[in-house]
Curated annotation (Swiss-Prot):
HAMAP family: PyrE
Glycosyltransferase among keywords: yes
Organism annotation: Hyphomonas neptunium (strain ATCC 15444)
Key words of the record: Glycosyltransferase, Magnesium, Pyrimidine biosynthesis, Transferase
InterPro entries the record matches: OPRT, Orotate_PRibTrfase_bac, PRibTrfase_dom, PRTase-like
Identification of the protein by name: Orotate phosphoribosyltransferase
One GO MF term: orotate phosphoribosyltransferase activity
Length: 193
């Protein structure tokens, strides 16, 4: 599956939006990937995650646990775990810090893959790496459906994406004239979970 194929799935779901958007990082963009619309469709979720899982075995070998941050890593983490024959767990925010709760555990020696839907700056990924550092498993790498950074984000481990895109984004005080004319909306989820 190519990056163009992945974007076609987002278009099919009505999830490739154009306008003026405030990204979770605070940066601005004329393109937003509303992944909730994709992951509301089990057929599309399975299609994307099955293709991503097929890429992972050669790089990471056997995976015991797939761990992702809430909210964005829950569905792709579950779907990847299903295709990899692994368990799926997720971290959630407690007092602003990601923690693994709800009885989730990782045993010494278990190989852990971090899963996320879309990576832009890598912040949620790095926070998940930090939360996993408190547990005895071994983080072998990470996976995401779309790497919006075009491979530039520092995620704290090796990252394999199903697609890489490089949509321009801007600091709020350095917008191009065409975005300055459009009211900004914030469709993301950071701060909600």
């Amino acid at each position: 599956m190519t990056s163009e194929d992945v974007l076609a799935v987002f278009k099919e779901a009505g999830a490739l939006l154009e306008g003026h958007f405030i990204l979770s990082s605070g940066r601005r963009s004329s393109v937003f990937l509303q992944k909730a619309l994709v992951f509301s469709r089990p057929d599309l979720s399975e299609k994307l995650c099955k293709a991503l899982a097929a890429r992972l075995a050669a790089d990471f070998g056997k995976i015991d646990v797939v761990a992702g941050p809430a909210v964005g890593g829950i569905i792709p983490g579950y779907e990847l775990a299903r295709h990899l024959g692994a368990r799926a767990i997720f971290a959630e925010r407690v007092d602003g810090q990601l923690q693994f709760r709800r009885g989730f555990s990782i045993a010494a020696g278990e190989r852990v893959l971090i899963a996320e839907d879309i990576v832009t700056t890598g912040l949620s990924f790095r926070e998940t790496v930090e939360a996993l550092a408190k547990l005895p498993g071994e983080v072998v790498g990470g996976a995401c459906i779309i790497d919006r950074s075009g491979g530039r984000a520092d995620v704290g481990c090796k990252l394999i994406s199903l697609a890489q895109v490089n949509f321009p984004d801007y600091a709020p005080d350095d917008l191009p004239p065409e975005l300055q004319k459009i009211e900004a909306i914030k469709p993301g989820s950071r701060g909600l979970a």
